[in-house]
Regions:
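Extended, low-complexity, charged alpha-helical tracts
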Residues: 1-167
């Protein structure tokens, strides 16, 4: 019998299946396995969706905190937003997150924050999109192309900032 090093999800599945098989008896093993695996998968997907929601909220909170700090120490808000977006995207890459999705979320939230504090939204968009592209360029050519493409399609006004040809 093969021994595996199980992840937390694997251990949970194993324990749930053992319990289901013992509870239902061996007569209904296949049905118990199907139902248990379905339940574990649904819980896993739900957990992942909650992480994604928390990540989006966290990005918004980070950006609001950065804008607040910039105002408190009289720092350039747009420079702060550009650097914050750049940092978020590079960090996302480091933990294996979807860099394109994170770039869109961070860029949208930063542009929104700029508008809320009375900054020129057009100039903010230019600075923030530039920060996102710089981060993606530093990550690598695949990230660079993906971020440029998704921002062009997702962020109003970014097509004028992102010029072809690119990597």
């Amino acid at each position: 019998m093969n021994e595996y090093t199980l992840t937390a999800i694997g251990r949970t599945t194993k324990k749930a299946l053992i319990g289901a098989i013992k509870t239902t008896g061996y007569t209904y093993t296949a049905g118990a396995i199907v139902e248990t695996v379905r339940d574990v998968l649904l819980k896993t997907v739900y957990g992942v969706s909650q992480i994604a929601k928390a990540l989006d909220k966290g990005i918004a909170d980070i950006i609001k905190g950065a804008v607040s700090a910039a105002g408190e120490v009289s720092e350039d808000t747009l420079l702060t937003l550009k650097a914050t977006v750049k940092g978020i995207i590079k960090c996302a890459s480091g933990v294996g997150a979807d860099v394109g999705k994170i770039a869109v979320t961070a860029t949208q939230e930063a542009i929104k924050a700029a508008g809320e504090v009375g900054a020129d939204v057009g100039e903010a968009t230019k600075q923030i999109v530039t920060g996102a592209i710089e981060a993606a360029d530093e990550i690598g050519s695949g990230a660079s192309k993906a971020v440029r493409n998704i921002l062009k399609d997702s962020i109003k006004g970014s097509k004028d900032i992102i010029k072809a040809p690119f990597i």
